[in-house]
Amino acid sequence: MDWKKIDDDKYVILKNEAGLHIDKGNNLAGDLLIFDSQTLTIDKVNKRYADVPPKISIEVDVDVALDELTEHSYMSIKTEKLLGFGVEKVIWFLTASKKVMIATPGSDWQLRDWDKDVEILDGIVCNVGRYLKEKGSEFA
């Protein structure tokens, strides 16, 4: 995916486990969050958490200690929380299975191979499998 194609006047990108404050005592972190710049205005930015929903949430694998939940259960719960908070699209890239899960509100969630195009937003697509193959990665 070519991040340079994302209009940085229209969108704000937060990464590296950026925090979201869903409600009291309910905070989540995201690998990559894409906000509409009209939603995440400068007065909504602080040191801890964004309290407005991103337009897109992108996650790579489940990288938390799962005491009593399966990986699938954790993904489902987190995805439901994000969609309930107002996120328009949640995308999970899963390296072990080489799959991508895409969830949007009011629609069936999709699971596809990661060598298929995935629209992130505004016609910008990501194809992890193709990218890795082009780079000669053994993980393609």
Language model segments and positions:
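C-terminal interaction segment
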Residues: 1-12, 16-140
